[in-house]
Amino acid sequence: MISGDDAAVAPLLVGASAGGTAVELRVLGPVEAVVGGRPVDLGPPKQRALLTLLASRVGRPVAVDVLLEALWAGTPPPAALASLRAYVANLRRVLEPDRAPRAPATVLRTYAAGYLLDSHHVEVDVHRFIGHATAGRDAWRGGDPQRALSEFEAGLA
């Protein structure tokens, strides 16, 4: 629940919905993921890069051709599409460990000709930081330095 003090942050918070798998992505610093309160292994560098790219666009689909070009610096090898699909499958297993076989993915979803991280199931630290920084700036401008300090500290926590 968002209190009145947190209302300014609400549009920028992206978090797990009730009953959904709670996935926290940390991209400020080394890329990490926490699922159900536990850190998880994100796999090899390209797989981590895929997750980072999708995390930068939470809730928005990213086309397969954009992913291929980004992951292989504009020159994807012939097996790139198969590798991308394997990375997606691996990340789905890691991000949704309790998902039944053949059940639709809810965190890393296929969308049209691409993939997206569902904003109802993923929280990204940079969004939380931006929300607190914005609320802190607004509090400072509004003449409330105590609240501003509290927001800035929360953003850095």
Where are these regions (language model features)?
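Intrinsically disordered, low-complexity protein-interaction/activation regions
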Residues: 1-157
